């Protein structure tokens, strides 16, 4: 795919055109492992579910790795749909460039995963920005803008079977929790968090953002929202990344909804993930979930539910179903009806 060249920061005049080198008379042919809004827009379906998930296998070096991802979309589904199809491909391409030695180095893998997250987000955001100024149809521009005007968190887990290591990269407030039984079959089960909640309620995130944008005292609300959003890191979200002039042009030309007019030093948000890894032991299981799940269920309760299911495997199937139902009722009834947030969860072991 040809890389789009977005207008420089501060570019905001409708009579100026950004040169992206695309064929505006038809959809161009793109590699299927690279994001291209023109090709991908052909398969978009209208739906109301903003969250998405992915899982599968990918060859890394000579090993058959596994991946699992959850994508918590907001302001629409366009961004999470892009991440479902492309994020693991961007990561795989970065891993393919590593030597055999580096594939055994967790720090090198961390750098590769971070680079893939940033590269895909840059393409999403810059492609939407370029679409405002190119001589294309309004419909095509809207399709290209959508993934950047919507937003999504991303949580991606990779499992290296040769080293029995799982690598977790997260941007946003989705969460990964490992369940592990200590001291053999008779030990207690523990929950091990493998991600960081990137939200306005995280003091470390508040300190980081305030340090990057000194003197801007309206970034966080009293309720802890960051420029109107609960998350501090995400894909897309042009309102927190585009220059002020571009947001005005988007508002005037494409009915864009701009909530914050006090834009001084964008970008404010980033898709840079925190990356963690852990050596997997026999019997471990991994839970990936969006914040809609974790708002209702603690790390410990989630591990407890899966533990009941594991222990029920050797029991009568009717009792197994009963245990699962009881666990779900106990953990969810505390907050029933208090949240309209979407829930997306993946459990693997």
Which sequence ranges carry the predicted segments?
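PP2C/PPM-type serine/threonine phosphatase catalytic core
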Residues: 1-67, 73-349
């Amino acid at each position: 795919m040809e890389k789009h060249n977005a207008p420089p920061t501060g570019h905001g005049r409708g009579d100026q055109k950004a040169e992206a080198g695309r064929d505006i008379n038809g959809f161009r042919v793109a590699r299927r492992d690279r994001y291209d809004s023109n090709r991908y827009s052909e398969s978009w379906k209208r739906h109301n579910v903003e969250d998405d998930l992915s899982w599968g296998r990918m060859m890394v070096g000579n090993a058959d790795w596994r991946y699992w991802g959850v994508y918590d979309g907001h302001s629409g589904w366009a961004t999470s749909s892009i991440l479902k199809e492309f994020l693991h491909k961007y990561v795989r391409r970065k891993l393919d460039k590593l030597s055999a030695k580096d594939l055994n180095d967790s720090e090198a893998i961390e750098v590769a995963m971070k680079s893939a997250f940033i590269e895909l987000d840059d393409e999403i955001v810059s492609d939407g920005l370029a679409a405002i100024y190119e001589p294309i149809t309004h419909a095509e521009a809207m399709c290209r803008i959508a993934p950047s005007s919507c937003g999504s968190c991303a949580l991606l887990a990779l499992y290296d079977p040769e080293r029995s290591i799982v690598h977790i990269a997260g941007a946003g407030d989705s969460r990964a929790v490992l369940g592990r039984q200590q001291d053999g079959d008779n030990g207690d089960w523990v929950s091990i968090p493998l991600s960081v909640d990137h939200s306005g309620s995280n003091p470390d995130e508040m300190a980081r953002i305030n340090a990057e944008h000194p003197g801007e005292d309206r970034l966080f609300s009293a309720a802890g929202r960051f420029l109107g959003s609960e998350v501090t890191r995400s894909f897309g979200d042009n309102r927190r990344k585009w220059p002020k002039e571009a947001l005005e042009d988007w508002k005037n030309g494409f009915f864009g909804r701009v909530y914050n007019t006090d834009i001084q030093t964008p970008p404010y948000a980033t898709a840079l993930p925190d990356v963690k890894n852990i050596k997997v032991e026999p019997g471990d299981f991994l839970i990936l979930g969006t914040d809609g799940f974790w708002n209702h269920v603690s790390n410990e309760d989630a591990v407890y539910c899966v533990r009941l299911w594991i222990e029920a495997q050797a029991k009568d199937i009717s009792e197994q179903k009963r245990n699962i139902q009881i666990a779900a009722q106990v953990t969810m009834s505390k907050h029933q009806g208090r949240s309209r947030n979407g829930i997306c969860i993946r459990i693997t072991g």
